[in-house]
């Protein structure tokens, strides 16, 4: 089952580059800031990651099992019938897409030529652009390929698929879990599971699992006054 054509056109208008049937790449704001103004995101300060070397991507840019109230992205998931795109194809096509998206910066006098050339070969892959990446059944293979190509990986998940994280091999360089509610009532109100009434219970299992995962872990909060 491929991407909805209306959604695909909308994402492309928003400067997403669609990769395969469900993948996507979009240049991060901080990648642009690094090239144009030598500014870095928090990853630069905390982990020494150069923003111009970071590729923002997702293997399932159009698919998520939640419809969070704060999310500006458009959820478009009704089933779990996803195409398992070849991980090598996904990675190579994502890098090609990143290069195309950065091509215009090469002629900008504000962008140092050496830095722009360096950005053509991403060193860090942020699997966080859109959708829920743990829905991609070959995620472990994809992460493994990134690591074998000398790239670090940062995986952002809503934490509702603990079995995927438990079996994930290898683990990402850094794992981010969205923690947006203290209990089921608020979770259901804020995160709005689309078809899984046990999403909160699954999320709790992920929280219990985290101490056993041998990688850097970050709890990511989106706070809304008076709501969560």
Language model features by range: what are they?
Residues 89-119:
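Short Fe-S-cluster ligation motifs
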Residues 108-228:
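Conserved AdoMet/S-adenosylmethionine-binding subsite of the radical SAM
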Residues 1-70, 74-100:
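Flexible, acidic/Gly-rich N-terminal and inter-domain linker regions that tether
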């Amino acid at each position: 089952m491929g991407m909805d054509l209306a959604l695909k056109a909308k994402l492309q208008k928003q400067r997403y580059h669609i990769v395969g049937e469900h993948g996507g790449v979009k240049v991060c704001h901080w990648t642009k800031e690094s090239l144009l103004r030598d500014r870095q995101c928090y990853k630069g300060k905390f982990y020494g990651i150069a923003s111009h070397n970071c590729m923002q991507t997702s293997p399932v840019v159009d698919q998520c099992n939640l419809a969070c109230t704060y999310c500006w992205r458009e959820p478009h998931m009704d089933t779990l019938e996803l195409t398992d795109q070849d991980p090598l194809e996904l990675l190579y096509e994502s890098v090609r897409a990143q290069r195309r998206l950065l091509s215009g910066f090469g002629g900008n006098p504000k962008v140092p030529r050496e830095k722009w050339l360096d950005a053509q070969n991403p060193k860090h892959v942020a699997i966080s652009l859109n959708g829920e990446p743990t829905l991609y059944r070959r995620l472990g293979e994809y992460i493994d390929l990134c690591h074998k190509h000398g790239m670090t990986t940062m995986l952002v998940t809503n934490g509702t698929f603990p079995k995927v994280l438990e079996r994930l091999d290898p683990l990402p360089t850094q794992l981010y879990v969205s923690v947006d509610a203290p209990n089921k009532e608020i979770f259901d109100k804020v995160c709005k599971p689309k078809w899984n009434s046990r999403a909160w219970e699954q999320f709790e299992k992920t929280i219990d699992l985290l101490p056993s995962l041998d990688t850097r872990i970050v709890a990511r909060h989106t706070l809304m006054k008076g709501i969560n």
